[in-house]
């Protein structure tokens, strides 16, 4: 069980990125979800004062990390970033198309959270900040893949290009 938890913690950033992207997709006040998640993450980080040294090793010196799982997580982030960019592009388009109005109700998620066609200027700012924060955090995946050769390096360049940083 401990080894599972050690490896599952590497899903924290991808889950936060997906949730922030969903907030931008939903729009309205939810477009600010990424900004809120950043501060929640900072508070948790400061409160725990726990610094990780990696997954660690067993008594025989073998890593407890699942290399395949960790690599798939990094590669999985490329389609997530592409979708995040497309969602943000749609939000900018809907802002322009509806003149800064929310427009019609598209759907209601769980009967609680309304999703509108358009987006207001204030919520577009929230969407932009949320996108910038979490696509910026996502640069880590592109950076780590840039240490590889072949296919992984190509994927890293694409990821870095999506964030506007190809160092």
Please report, for each region that a protein language model flagged, where it lies by residue.
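Juxtamembrane helix-capping/reentrant segments at transmembrane boundaries
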Residues: 56-80
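Transmembrane alpha-helix boundary signature
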Residues: 49-55, 82-122, 140-144
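N-terminal membrane topogenic signal
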Residues: 1-12
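Hydrophobic alpha-helical transmembrane segments of multi-pass integral membrane proteins
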Residues: 73-88, 130-134
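Residue-level signature of transmembrane alpha-helical entry/exit and packing/kink sites
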Residues: 74, 120-128
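Central hydrophobic cores of alpha-helical transmembrane segments in multi-pass inner-membrane proteins
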Residues: 34-57, 81, 135-139
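Short, hydrophobic transmembrane alpha-helix segments
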Residues: 18-33
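Membrane-embedded catalytic scaffold of the fatty acid hydroxylase/desaturase
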Residues: 127-167
């Amino acid at each position: 069980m401990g080894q599972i938890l050690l490896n599952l913690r590497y899903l924290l950033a991808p889950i936060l990125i997906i949730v922030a992207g969903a907030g931008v997709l939903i729009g309205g006040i939810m477009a600010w979800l990424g900004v809120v998640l950043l501060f929640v993450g900072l508070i948790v980080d400061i409160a725990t004062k726990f610094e990780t040294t990696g997954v660690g090793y067993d008594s025989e010196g073998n890593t407890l990390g699942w290399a395949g799982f960790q690599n798939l997580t990094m590669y999985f982030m490329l389609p997530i970033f592409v979708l995040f960019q497309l969602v943000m592009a749609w939000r900018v388009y809907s802002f322009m198309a509806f003149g800064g109005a929310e427009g019609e109700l598209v759907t209601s998620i769980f009967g609680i959270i309304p999703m509108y066609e358009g987006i207001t200027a204030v919520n577009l700012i929230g969407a932009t900040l949320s996108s910038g924060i979490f696509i910026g955090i996502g640069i880590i995946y592109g950076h780590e893949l840039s240490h590889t050769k072949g296919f992984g390096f190509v994927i890293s360049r694409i990821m870095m290009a999506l964030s506007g940083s190809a160092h």
